[in-house]
């Protein structure tokens, strides 16, 4: 399983999907302060929310598992001796590792644009939050595997993912980064990890 994870990780490194997603993330975090006029009080109070929204929309653009289904890789995974949900979960984790590495490399720019201080809670919030976003987008991608057209795929992704993330965005993006936000994120994480194998089995049963 460790070898499989490394293979999936290197496959993702040379894929254009993480590059595209991170490019969109950079675009969102740069354009948002420009649109808001660099209002210091607003950016300082809602910086986590704005960063989360930028992460969300950049992650929504990633066609998780769609390319694998089109080229037959999913079928090979299914016929192999490995557990398919674990393979897909490892692929999501590999994508998240690449994404969060890029985000943390750009953290000084985030502090400069959004004018907030260095806080370990911010790092932890973004770390856990991006992992939850990746899992949730992966779940909705599995549910959208039956959609063949790109426009239909994107429409279903946005329609189903955005309402699901509303409670998460409301409770975890305020200026008061209390510990219950972290506990809520951990709860979301374990919920989605437990739901992932079930939803993968349902969506791929055909």
From Swiss-Prot:
One of its GO terms (molecular function) is heme transmembrane transporter activity. It comes from the Eukaryota. The keyword Membrane applies. Keywords: Cytochrome c-type biogenesis, Membrane, Mitochondrion, Transmembrane, Transmembrane helix, Transport. It is found in: Mitochondrion membrane. It is a multi-pass membrane protein. The chain crosses the membrane at residues 18-38, 45-65, 87-107, 126-146, 182-202. It holds the Pfam family CcmB. GO terms for biological process: cytochrome c biosynthetic process; cytochrome complex assembly. May be involved in the export of heme to the mitochondrion for the biogenesis of c-type cytochromes. Belongs to the CcmB/CycW/HelB family. This is Putative cytochrome c biogenesis ccmB-like mitochondrial protein. The gene is CCMB.
């Amino acid at each position: 399983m460790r070898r499989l994870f490394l293979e999936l990780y290197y496959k993702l490194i040379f894929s254009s999907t993480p590059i595209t997603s991170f490019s969109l993330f950079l675009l969102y975090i740069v354009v948002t302060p420009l649109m808001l006029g660099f209002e210091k009080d607003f950016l300082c109070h809602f910086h986590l929310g704005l960063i989360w929204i930028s992460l969300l929309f950049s992650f929504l653009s990633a066609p998780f598992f769609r390319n694998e289904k089109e080229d037959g890789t999913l079928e090979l995974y299914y016929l192999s001796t490995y557990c398919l949900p674990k393979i897909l979960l490892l692929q999501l984790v590999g994508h998240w590792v690449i994404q969060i590495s890029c985000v943390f490399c750009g953290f000084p720019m985030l502090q400069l644009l959004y004018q907030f201080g260095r806080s370990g809670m911010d790092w932890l919030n973004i770390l856990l939050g991006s992992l939850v976003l990746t899992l949730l987008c992966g779940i909705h991608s599995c549910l959208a595997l039956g959609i063949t057209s790109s426009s239909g795929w994107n429409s279903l992704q946005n329609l189903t993912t955005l309402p699901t993330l509303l409670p998460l965005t409301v409770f975890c993006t305020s200026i008061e980064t209390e510990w219950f936000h972290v506990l809520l994120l951990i709860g979301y994480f374990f919920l989605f990890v437990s739901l992932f194998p079930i939803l993968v089995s349902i969506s791929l049963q055909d």
